[in-house]
């Protein structure tokens, strides 16, 4: 699994409860937290005000779906969640262990390596370079951006914004299934 968040600007019709300002991404709006499988399809989704940090948003999303991890047998291999460098593993682990102490027996968090400027120059690349395996979550975020209703937050509530995000992925998965001969 791979996790990421995406800050999205609000339009004028968004309610005060759904507004927040993300200083890191300089965005006034909401954050979409997304955990996807290796195909880029959503496993868990959550929308929060943009002032909620990536760590807290991921913890909220996992706590809302904690029964998935509680029901997972110990005999199965650990689930690896690949995150970018915007997440702080020590904070994540301490918050999740307070909710479910056995979580580390079933889940393993891993930060994706950030390419240095020298490594980029060696490859002859500049600017944003997708990290190995992280391109899947970046592609999922791009799929959401292709849905016209998700380019900005047009919804009044966070529940409606989450429903729109889920609906976008349902449409995408149905299109994929219909394309199979």
Feature locations, PLM:
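Charged phosphate-binding loop/patch that engages nucleotide di/tri-phosphates or the phosphate backbone
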Residues: 164-181
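Tryptophan-centered motif/residue detector
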Residues: 6, 42-43, 135, 143, ...
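Polybasic low-complexity intrinsically disordered regions
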Residues: 1-98, 105, 112-114, 168
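Helix-centered, glycine/charged polyanion-binding patches within enzymatic domains
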Residues: 70-159
